[in-house]
Design a protein with these regions (language model features):
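Short, small-residue-biased leader/transition segments that mark boundaries at the very start
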Residues: 2-4, 8-13
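ATP/Mg2+ or Mg2+-diphosphate-binding catalytic cores
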Residues: 144, 251-279
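An alpha-helical support segment within catalytic cores of ATP-dependent transferases
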Residues: 114-172, 182, 231
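Active-site Asp-x-Gly
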Residues: 181-227, 231-234, 264-267, 272, ...
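A glycine-centered beta->alpha junction motif in the catalytic cores
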Residues: 46, 80-98, 114-117, 132-142, ...
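Active-site acidic catalytic loop and adjacent metal/ATP-binding pocket
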Residues: 25-33, 40-41, 71, 155-200
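Protein kinase glycine-rich loop
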Residues: 18-22
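A conserved alpha-helical element in kinase catalytic cores
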Residues: 37-80, 87-112
Length: 279
């Protein structure tokens, strides 16, 4: 059990909770600890993806505050979390520009994905399992005689996973709204908890912010992000772009038959183009 020393998650939940978010996967309350420190209580809903949230808690325990919010306690489907403030990386994009936001993300990922002495939690999901929807969609397309981006991306993903260099614990869903500026500096929240090459841990950033297609489709931005992340993570930018392309096609497979699928595929195609022409 990882209940906090001061109080169980369920006890804290009774202290003046203010509901601040109601998402498809959880209810999120802001609470005060006995000493007045703000904290977050996250109540998980009984959804199909609850395993992601539970793995994410194991990831936070493993990080122990290094680049991520601290998990202060957990009880059944309640989590007591360090309060990470209200300022997101998306605010930096809006106020100071995308370049500065990318540099902040690169610096944080360098800390988050650095080699660790701590053994990886056994609960973390292997990256290949995370890509199941892409591999299935690629098989379906191939069986139908279609050579699609899904087929191409599945081949690339399979090759990279088969000859992976060092595996690290990954956040798994990093984007501009779960990188927060806290009293301890920039931290991540809401991890999924994966194990894979570091480039896969950066891939989702190329598709964000979600409302800024002008950025996500811009070849200069794609190249600038690849270069910044390549330096920070010590990864070949070509491999990073391949991972970002494959990840976008995975996201598109999850979002099949909707507007999001088309958005994901358009950005993935732009990433593939930059990879082929600039590197």
């Amino acid at each position: 059990s990882t209940l906090s020393s001061s109080s169980a998650a369920s006890d804290v939940y009774k202290r003046q909770p203010v509901l601040i978010a109601d998402t498809f996967s959880s209810l999120v309350w802001k609470v005060s600890l006995p000493d007045g420190t703000p904290a977050i209580v996250k109540g998980l809903k009984p959804i199909e993806d609850i395993a992601d949230e539970l793995r994410g808690a194991d990831y936070l325990v493993w990080r122990n505050g290094r680049g991520a919010v601290r998990l202060l306690g957990r009880e059944n489907n309640l989590m007591l979390l360090e309060y990470a403030g209200e300022r997101m990386l998306s605010h930096i994009v809006a106020e100071h520009g995308d370049y500065q936001a990318t540099e902040i993300a690169a610096e944080l990922m360098a800390k988050l994905y650095a080699a660790s002495e701590e053994p990886l939690p056994s609960a973390l999901l292997p990256i290949r399992d995370r890509f199941a929807a892409l591999f299935q969609r690629a098989r379906d397309d191939q069986n139908a005689g279609c050579q699609t981006d899904y087929v191409h991306a599945a081949i690339i993903a399979d090759q990279m996973m088969s000859n992976a260099s060092e595996l690290r614990g990954l956040h798994g869903d990093l984007h501009h709204e779960n990188i927060m500026f806290s009293s301890r500096g920039w931290l991540v929240i809401d991890p999924v908890g994966l194990v894979g090459e570091v480039g896969f841990g950066a891939a989702n950033m190329f598709y964000d912010p979600a409302d800024r297609d002008d950025l996500c489709l811009d070849p200069r931005r794609i190249a600038q992000m690849a270069d910044a992340f390549s330096r920070a993570l010590d990864v070949d930018p070509r491999r990073l772009l391949d991972q970002a392309y494959a990840y976008g096609c995975l996201s598109a497979a999850w979002n099949a038959d909707g507007e999001e699928e088309q958005r994901d595929l358009a950005i993935a195609a732009a990433i593939k183009q930059v990879r082929q022409t600039s590197y």
